[in-house]
Every structure is written in structure tokens, then in C-alpha cells.
Amino acid sequence: MKILFEFIQDKLDIDLQTNSTYKENLKCGHFNGLDEILTTCFALPNSRKIALPCLPGDLSHKAVIDHCIIYLLTGELYNNVLTFGYKIARNEDVNNSLFCHSANVNVTLLKGAAWKMFHSLVGTYAFVDLLINYTVIQFNGQFFTQIVGNRCNEPHLPPKWAQRSSSSSATAAQIKQLTEPVTNKQFLHKLNINSSSFFPYSKILPSSSSIKKLTDLREAIFPTNLVKIPQRLKVRINLTLQKLLKRHKRLNYVSILNSICPPLEGTVLDLSHLSRQSPKERVLKFIIVILQKLLPQEMFGSKKNKGKIIKNLNLLLSLPLNGYLPFDSLLKKLRLKDFRWLFISDIWFTKHNFENLNQLAICFISWLFRQLIPKIIQTFFYCTEISSTVTIVYFRHDTWNKLITPFIVEYFKTYLVENNVCRNHNSYTLSNFNHSKMRIIPKKSNNEFRIIAIPCRGADEEEFTIYKENHKNAIQPTQKILEYLRNKRPTSFTKIYSPTQIADRIKEFKQRLLKKFNNVLPELYFMKFDVKSCYDSIPRMECMRILKDALKNENGFFVRSQYFFNTNTGVLKLFNVVNASRVPKPYELYIDNVRTVHLSNQDVINVVEMEIFKTALWVEDKCYIREDGLFQGSSLSAPIVDLVYDDLLEFYSEFKASPSQDTLILKLADDFLIISTDQQQVINIKKLAMGGFQKYNAKANRDKILAVSSQSDDDTVIQFCAMHIFVKELEVWKHSSTMNNFHIRSKSSKGIFRSLIALFNTRISYKTIDTNLNSTNTVLMQIDHVVKNISECYKSAFKDLSINVTQNMQFHSFLQRIIEMTVSGCPITKCDPLIEYEVRFTILNGFLESLSSNTSKFKDNIILLRKEIQHLQAYIYIYIHIVN
């Protein structure tokens, strides 16, 4: 990367000392801005150079830029920042006329006087080459902005979405769909309420084996536009499918279910609701038995193939929420020639026949794991995560319905009323209401459940497109505006937006106390509580009052899409920024994405009113609207709750600290934490919480209110939003049990390590390895918890991959990288080599202990870790002797 001044001289071989054009412009100095762009802009070549457009010789400066934009657009190079906001208008009068639906600031800048002079200085060819084949980044004294080139200097290629849309073949899309990763979404959260049968197993497969049903089933498994089946093979496949349907008709599903996964005896009161789940191992056994009795032996092909399919079935049932299995892993180690029902044995096995067999096998395995197995699972089990976790649990439908029926009856009676004026629940455009489907999630507390409203997205593709447009142009901008209004409002307490900020806020409070009390913490009083059924209890009219108050000093909103590239982590994130309120940090590269939405104050009010007053829950053939409160799951519910509970903290004087006292109040959603030197204030807040916050219709969960003192018990640790807080020393850490195991599914070891580094960075972003907050022992304990989590993710990611020399070298580089990240985040290590040694040892030893559970698999990694620890011990031995 070179500054433009050097780029002109080195790349273009222009001697600025003797160039007459430059000298003439230089006389004007800063008045024309040329000198500024030469010294503040940097050029970086694209790794994939492309041909330049052919331009007429008489074009103006602005016309040259427009032609470059058209050239990029026609080549579908939409990642180039010059194309952002532009489209090509095509009609019978105009062939290639640029249309700009949002102002592109970069193009406006390039069309200015300074860049026009630069154009005249270097010539049109060099100027166009710079626009097409380079990235230009400008520094404004505070941060960097990309003004030319592909986003983050990506190679010249159409973006993936353009490649997908340019493929006119529906067949190509269907083939791609066949080989996409397999997820558990097909069988999650499938309610079976008020059905004539708890287990409608007749719908798993057609109940008849007529020619039409056989043909329909065959074409569902082997789409005719994807694979050609010779007539003789059709007969063979039909015979196998006929056996399948006959077995289905004779199979006593419920008897097998009761034998393997029997309903638990006793009433709901006798057992906790979570203890009534069917163990995953039993569910697996049930599905295996069903498949063995349902599928003819030839469909498996062989015992080896059956074993592989069963192994993958176990992986499917073990997937966490949002987990997936790469499709090629389902095919791995399957012997295609064992699927004899998919080819004619007396036909010579040519390359073409093998390719056809391969395609048939892909279709069959895809159908098995995307259709048949999910249908079997969802027919007999309600599959769901437990609230705030990602592990999937399984309940028999009859057991689940018994558990939730009392809750649903009470919920509908208390909060909902039937919507008698709605007659079109399925349509997004023809109904005056926003319909949502009901999802029920069990909580950890006994017999407690959470209802989530999942927005319906329309009855067909056309309505889905309209839904997406409204979500992009109205809902998402309004969500960001609500967050902007919340952030802008001055409050007496410090607002936090994520659990990653908890430790930082407590550190600031702790440092303030230590400074005030001569490096000794005073006695502190803690209280935490959460609001009972917070979404259901939110008063909607109060919501609108708070919103309208927040809008009084506003004059509309511009919501602009902007990219921010973190140069430290290599992560590129897209943000919707309201009224230019986000300023790039010094380590960020700013890339304007141009797309802008403008909403007036009344627009915001209209969108919010539609969301909170006209969202309906669609259950079977009826829909229900709320009497009050909000549906959890709506895009706007969470920011509305934040606005309301911020107002609650400002309204009640009990939350205001006395002038001579120090109080920290943290609120995240409906969870509240108070830490204060003022015992009376905590007593007053507890009394208020016990009685309820009447103005806001909010009641605290009385059995979850916790109040402790730092002097009452030396070992008291409280949890707040999955963070552990040691009350005596005001130290904070995150336990490994609160960290989800991130499932990385990739065949690329390089990609796996890249994901692990990003995950490690997320884990230490909670800022709990700061010695201004925590003691050295707590810092080391936190590092150990993080390493436990990362090492488990590592073992899971390489479960089916071999550990070779290349991987071991990558593992070594990975260790060095996370050690560097940890040392960088723990400044005391720079002052004390012994602490740095302990940090390094904690990381290395943590991996060693974890990988030692499978010494045969990770033998090379273990040898490497032991050598690294020995080198570290030798180094510290020498250091101690030198110091002494």
C-alpha cells in the first residue's frame, strides 16, 4: 500500500518535481485540495486485475467516472464501493443510464475539483485503472475511509447473491439445495395441539402403494429434472419403494414408541417438567428401530452403510440450536455400489453409470435426512431448546401437551383475546394484522414456559418479497431508531447493551471506590432482581407515551447502511447507523454502503403502533391479539422494553444515589443489579420491588430477589446475566459452564482455526482478564475457563478430521496467536514476566489436559504441547536465576 504521492512517482513514473501540471496546481496549494489527497490517500492493487472499459476520447471527468460505474455494474461487480446506491435504468429510450437511489458520497467526492485535477495530472488511462483495479483508502486524521475499490480489497468477483440470481436454471438451484448442510430446523418446534391423534404417523409416508403414489414418492426422492432413471431401473426402484410403503402400513409405531420411550408415570406435580423429557439416547434407539423395520434392507445397501447412516443420525439428534452437518460428511465412507437398488447390475459400469448412481445416492441420502427422518422425529416428539441454552431436548407429544396445556389455557385467558375481525390469517398483504406463529420454549424453572411469536412471512414468494422489503425499509430502521433514542437519552445510571460490558462497568465502579477509600473496598450491598413476565406485562400506552416524549426533539431520521472493518480482528460488520451517530474507531476502516432510509417521526410511530397493537398470534384456524403487553419475538419488542425500563429507573427516586454514597445500577433487558455503599438505598429498592412498579405494571419475581452484603459471607458469589461476581472483592468472571460449545463444521483446518481464533476473541471480549478488576488468580482462572471451552470446540471440530503435520503446524500457530491475544488483553504481563509465564502455562496446560482425554487422536498435538511447556519451564528457570 502506497501513499498516492509515491504511487504516482513509482507506479506511473511521473516526476512531480518537474511536472508542469502539478506545479501549476501546487501554486494553489490547499485551495484546490490536490495536495491533500496526494498525502492522505493510499492505493492498494486488487489481487485480480481486470480489463479496463473502452471509453470515448472526449468524455468529461464526471462522465469518465459514470462510465466506470456502468462498467462495474454490467460486470456484476457489486462489491465495488463506487457501485453502491447505483442501478442501470433500462428502457426503450435509454440504454445505459445511471440511476442513483441513495447518494454515494465517494462518487460525489471523486467528481470534485481535487480529483478532477488528479485526473488531469495522471491521465485518463491511469485514472480509470485506479478506479477499476485498485483500492483507495483516505485518512482524515482520525480514521480511515475506503473511497475506491472492492470492499476490503476483495478480489474482482460478483458477490455470491449475484451469482445465485444470475443462474437462470431452476435445476442448478435444486442441485445446490440437495447438497446444502443438513440442520435440525425441519423438526424443531413442531407443535401438535388439539390433533385427533398425538402421533399422526400415517403422514410420514403415503398410506397407499398405488402406481400414482409410488410415482409421486419416487419423484419426490429422485426429481426428474435432476436425474434420469432408465425404465428398467424405475421398475427396480418402484419394487423397493413398494416394500417401503407396505412396511409403513404394517408398522406399529406407537407400540415401539411405548416400548423404548415410555411415558413417565405420575402427574406433572410429581416431576419437574424438564425431567419428563425423553433421553436423547432413547430417542436415537427408537428412530434406529423404526428405520430398521421401515426401510427394506436393500435401501441401506449393506451393514457398513447402515452403520454410517446410524452414526450420522446420532450426530443429527446431537446438533445444538442452529447447528448443521455438512452434506458431504453424510456421504463420506458410504459404498455407492452397495446401493444395488439404484442401478442395474447386469449393465456395464461405465463412468456415466457411476455418475448417475452417485446422483441417485445423493438424492436418496438428502431425502432420508431432510424428509423421512425429520418427519419421523417431529411425528412423535416435540423438539426444542431450553430457554437461554442451545442443547436440544425431546418430549413425547402427549407428554408435552399435558405439560403445556395448563400454561397455555392460563396464558390465553390472561393476555389474549380472539381476533374476530380477521378473516385472512395466511396472507401478509390482504390482512390488516401482522400474524405470527406460536413457539413454546421451556424455561429452567419448573413448569415455566416462554411463548415466542415467530413472524409469518406471507403465503407465497410474492408476499415473501413484500415482507422482506417492509422488514428492510421499515422494521429494521425503526429498530435502530429506537436503539438510537435510548442511547441518546441522558440517564442517572450507566446504560449497558451487552453482557460484555458488565465487567467493564464494575471495574470503573471498583476503581472509583478504591480511589475514594484509600485502596480499600468499603462494605458493599448487592441486590438483583428480574421482572416477572416482562414482555406480557409491558403497558402499551405507556410505551407510546415514552416513545412520543423521546421524539419531541427529533426531526426525522436518516438510517444509512455502513460497513466497519476491524483491522485488529479482520472482522467486517454491517451496521445501520442513525443520523451519522456512529464514528469509526481508530482501528476501523469505514466503508459507506450508501443505502439510506428516511423515516419521519410519524413513520416511526406508525410502525411501532402496527407492531404492538396489530400483531396477532395465529393458532390453528384462529388468531389472537393482546389485551396488553408485547409478544416476545417481535423485532421491536426488545428495544421497546429497554426504553420502558430505562424510564422506570428514572421515575422512581429509590434508584437515585445519595450525594455522599456510591451506587452502580446495571440493567440488561429485564435483569437488574444494584451495588451500593448505601444499605438503606438497597433496602428501599427491595421494598419497592417486592410491592411492584405500579406505573409500569411490572412485578419482580419475588422468589428470585437476592440481597447480600460483601461482609456477610467471605465466599458469596452471585450470578448476573451469566457473569459470576465475587461480592467480597468485587471480581467478575465468566464460568465455562455458561459458554456454549460452538460447533464448527468445516473440512478446512485453516478455516477451523480461523473460527476458533474469532471465538477466542469473543470469549476474552468480556474484559475479565484485566488486573484492574480481578486478582491474578482470578485472571488465570478466567483464562482456564476460556481454554476449557475453546479446547472442547477444537476437539469437536476435528472429530472426523485427521491430525497431520500441516495441521500440527497450524495448531502451533493457533496457540501462539491466542497467547498473543491474551497477553495483549492483560497489560500486567508486560510488567511482570512471571505472570506472563503463568498465562502461557495456563493456556498450554489447559489444552494438554483437555486433549489428553483422547491421546490416540491428538497424539501429535500433545507432544507439541509438552515440548512447549518444557521450553517455558526452562525459560522461567533461567529468568529466576538471573533475577536472583
UniProtKB/Swiss-Prot annotation:
InterPro entries reported for this sequence: RT_dom, Telomerase_RBD, Telomerase_RT
Residue numbers binding Mg(2+): 530, 670-671
Cell location: Nucleus; Chromosome, Telomere
Any GO BP: telomere maintenance via telomerase
Keywords, alphabetical: Chromosome, DNA-binding, Magnesium, Metal-binding, Nucleotidyltransferase, Nucleus, RNA-directed DNA polymerase, Telomere, Transferase
Keyword Magnesium recorded: yes
A UniProt-annotated Pfam family: Telomerase_RBD
Family classification: Belongs to the reverse transcriptase family. Telomerase subfamily.
Quaternary state and interactors: Catalytic subunit of the telomerase holoenzyme complex composed minimally of EST2 and the telomerase RNA template component.
UniProt name for this protein: Telomerase reverse transcriptase
Organism: Saccharomyces cerevisiae (strain ATCC 204508 / S288c) (Baker's yeast)
